[in-house]
Swiss-Prot record:
Its EC number is 2.3.1.274. GO terms for cellular component: cytoplasm. GO terms for molecular function: phosphate:acyl-[acyl carrier protein] acyltransferase activity. PANTHER family: FATTY ACID/PHOSPHOLIPID SYNTHESIS PROTEIN PLSX, PHOSPHATE ACYLTRANSFERASE. Homodimer. Probably interacts with PlsY. Pathway: Lipid metabolism; phospholipid metabolism. InterPro entries: FA_synthesis, Phospholipid_synth_PlsX-like. GO terms for biological process: fatty acid biosynthetic process; phospholipid biosynthetic process. It catalyses: a fatty acyl-[ACP] + phosphate = an acyl phosphate + holo-[ACP]. This is Phosphate acyltransferase. It comes from the Bacteria.
Length: 356
């Protein structure tokens, strides 16, 4: 494996360096070919590197940044005042070729705007989309996008997301001829927004896309599709609802509970069932799939959950490594070149509509 250099915005997220720096050391332990540029306040970073050994320090470099973009800042204001911020400096390292990818747990809107400004979208892509890979009950994986980068999406954008998601499923998840579906409120052709139905009509005409139609949200984890496409508002709400339910379910499995005294054999059976079920469903733990790729840019950017713990942020770093190794932006660009001649112009000009 060739050497990789990633830029980490270590000041972003709810916990900042207290989580991101230990996660960086964890990632270095897992990958001997990895070099990390830690972007942020050196006074906050340096004490957290006290436990790093000589070999780890040789693959670390602190890149000073003057400020941090607040998680509650309006994206437009954050972008205007972004010079010298840890997020912008990390993205500039990618733009300058000093790093091959950027990982940040910071403000999503600001990251989207700055990434688009500095790294530029691929030819033929209007706006990038946030994408992640979720496990499903068949022990496989489903690519889901958009997860919040674009609140309102027209039909053209949904088609572009489908193409990008299909490439990611093939190249990173290694699913041959991945099935692609649009998230909708029903499976019937007449259901949903005009933008969804218009996107569906176009996807049916693209030979390189294995389009299977609509899928409802309750089937997200069933494994019925390999790529699920939706607008960012719907995707973000769907993802967070699913994560909340999964966390509650796993928490209930692990809890001992309170109540009346039970015989020793019932308590033993209960604990065995808890451990067995926890192992069975542990692959659904959101920490294991943290890290959404900002797909559609000329460079690689990974958005971590703001509330990510050390383990989860280390997973986001690994997501960046995989995206760089698989050359995802280059492969998407190549696929777009082959698809565009098939016809991308939508009859309605890509306008959004109303629910039917």
């Amino acid at each position: 494996m060739t050497r990789l250099t990633l830029a980490l915005d270590v000041m972003g997220g709810d916990f900042g360096p207290s989580v991101t720096v230990p996660a960086a050391l964890q990632a270095l332990n897992s990958n001997s070919q990895l070099t990390l540029l830690l972007v942020g306040n050196s006074d906050a970073i340096t004490p957290l590197l006290a436990k790093a050994d000589f070999e780890q320090r040789s693959r670390l470099q602190i890149i000073p940044a003057q400020s941090v973009i607040a998680s509650d800042a309006r994206p437009s204001q954050a972008i205007r005042a972004s010079r010298g911020s840890s997020m912008r400096v990390a993205l500039e390292l990618v733009k300058e070729g000093r790093a091959q990818a950027c990982v940040s747990a910071g403000n999503t809107g600001a990251l989207m705007g700055l990434a688009k400004l500095l790294l530029k979208p691929l030819e033929g892509i209007e706006r990038p989309a946030l994408v992640t890979v979720l496990p499903h009950q068949q022990k496989g994986k489903t690519v889901v996008l958009d997860l919040g980068a674009n609140v309102d999406c027209d039909s053209t954008m949904l088609v572009q997301f489908a193409i990008m998601g299909s490439v990611l499923a093939e190249e990173v998840v290694e699913i041959p001829n991945p099935r692609v579906a649009l998230l909708n409120i029903g499976e019937e052709e007449v259901k949903g927004l005009d933008s969804i139905r218009d996107a569906s009509a176009v996807l049916k005409t693209i030979p390189s896309i294995n389009y299977i139609g609509y899928l409802e949200a309750n089937e997200l984890l069933t494994g019925k599709t390999d790529v699920l496409v939706c607008d960012g508002f719907t995707g973000n709400v769907t993802l967070k609802t699913m994560e909340g339910v999964v966390r509650m379910f796993l928490s209930l499995l692990k809890s001992q509970g309170e109540g009346k005294k039970r015989s020793w054999w019932l308590l033993l059976l209960k604990r065995w069932l808890q451990k067995s079920l926890t192992r069975r469903f542990s692959h659904l733990n959101p920490d294991q799939y943290n890290g959404a790729c900002l797909l559609g840019l000329r460079g690689t950017v990974i958005k971590s959950h703001g509330a990510a713990n050390q383990r989860a942020f280390a997973v986001a770093i690994e997501q960046a490594v995989q995206a760089v190794q698989r050359q995802v932006p280059q492969r998407i660009a190549a696929r777009l070149e082959s698809v565009y001649p098939a016809g991308f112009e939508l009859l309605d000009g890509g306008k959004s509509g109303t629910l039917r």
